[in-house]
């Protein structure tokens, strides 16, 4: 008897809970049961969207916090306006996921009995078999799994659980939001890898402390905080190697600090290859004008003390 070749096909399944959680848990279940030769892949098809909103200091609607997160970024447009970039991802099919499998009763039983999955499109529950995607849609899905969109104006990011499509004019080849940066090449104080990431954050932090300590000797003892987030700043939250200073209460302002302000989102220039985003928390005027900048190193938020010449505003590429 001639053996019939079993060809895997893509199916669509509705889910009742968070889609990526179902995908992740189902993949783990399939592997644990040894069915990964029948249920070959599970994915969510998503679209990444960008919402841009401009806030003005003069309008009084500036949010209390300008902190960057994984999906929210803040940028300075000018001395009065800030740009909030919110990145979101949504399921293109609503509450549906894609499942690639070689149909069998056992594989089908695993799928339909899995928590969070309410069935497969085409199956009525009365003995009707699920309906696979037509060949054209299946081919498109396979192409996207290779990181290639069927739409030339789109880019594709493939993760362990999802296929994420996004506008090519908003995201670069690495699927990072497109920004226009100023580039400078100050003295290197940290080793970086090919991606520009710090190799040893402890070494980096130590280098910063040593660099700032050497410069601190040149400071006057009457260095003052000329502008801060609050009228009073607790010295214990600042960097311990800032030296002696006095806290100036009220909204004292010095105009000659290269137009930097507390709350500005800036780029910290460390080497010719690495640029870290941070937020100004306080400004100082002394022998050398400096700023206290909050940056994130791995998962830890730190305050670092840097000369203003090592900072620059982040410029956003404007569309005309």
From Swiss-Prot:
CDD domains: NGN_Bact_1. It comes from Mycoplasma pneumoniae (strain ATCC 29342 / M129 / Subtype 1). This is Transcription termination/antitermination protein NusG. Participates in transcription elongation, termination and antitermination. It comes from the Bacteria. GO terms for biological process: DNA-templated transcription termination; regulation of DNA-templated transcription elongation; transcription antitermination; transcription elongation-coupled chromatin remodeling. InterPro entries: NGN (IPR047050), NGN-like_dom (IPR006645), NGN_dom_sf (IPR036735), NusG-like (IPR043425), Transcrpt_antiterm_NusG (IPR001062), Transcrpt_antiterm_NusG_myco (IPR010216). GO terms for cellular component: cytosol. NCBIfam families: NusG_myco (TIGR01956).
């Amino acid at each position: 008897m001639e053996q019939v070749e079993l060809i895997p096909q893509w199916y669509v399944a509705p889910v009742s809970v968070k889609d990526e959680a179902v995908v992740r848990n189902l993949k783990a279940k399939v592997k644990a049961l040894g069915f990964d030769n029948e249920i070959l892949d599970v994915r969510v098809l998503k679209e990444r969207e960008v919402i841009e909103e401009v806030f003005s200091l003069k309008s009084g609607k500036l949010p209390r916090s300008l902190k960057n997160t994984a999906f929210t970024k803040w940028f300075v447009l000018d001395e009065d306006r800030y740009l909030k970039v919110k990145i979101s991802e949504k399921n293109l099919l609503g509450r549906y996921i894609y499942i690639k499998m070689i149909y069998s009763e056992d594989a089908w039983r695993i799928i339909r009995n899995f928590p969070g999955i309410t069935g497969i499109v085409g199956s009525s529950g009365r003995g009707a078999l699920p309906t696979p995607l037509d060949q054209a849609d299946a081919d498109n899905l396979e192409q996207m799994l290779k990181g290639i969109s069927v739409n030339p104006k789109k880019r594709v990011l493939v993760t362990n659980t999802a296929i994420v499509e996004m506008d090519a004019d908003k995201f670069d080849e690495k699927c990072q939001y497109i920004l226009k940066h100023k580039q400078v090449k100050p003295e290197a104080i940290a080793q970086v890898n090919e991606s520009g990431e710090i190799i040893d954050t402890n070494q980096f932090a130590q280098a910063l402390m040593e660099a700032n300590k050497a410069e601190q000797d040149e400071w006057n003892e009457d260095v003052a905080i000329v502008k801060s987030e609050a009228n009073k700043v607790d010295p214990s939250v600042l960097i311990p190697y800032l030296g002696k200073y006095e806290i100036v209460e009220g909204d004292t302002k010095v105009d000659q600090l290269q137009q930097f302000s507390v709350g500005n989102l800036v780029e910290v220039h460390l080497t010719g290859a690495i640029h870290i985003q941070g937020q100004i928390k306080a400004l100082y005027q002394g022998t050398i004008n400096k700023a206290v900048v909050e940056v994130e190193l791995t998962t830890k938020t730190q305050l670092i003390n840097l000369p203003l010449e090592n900072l620059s505003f982040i410029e956003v590429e404007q569309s005309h």
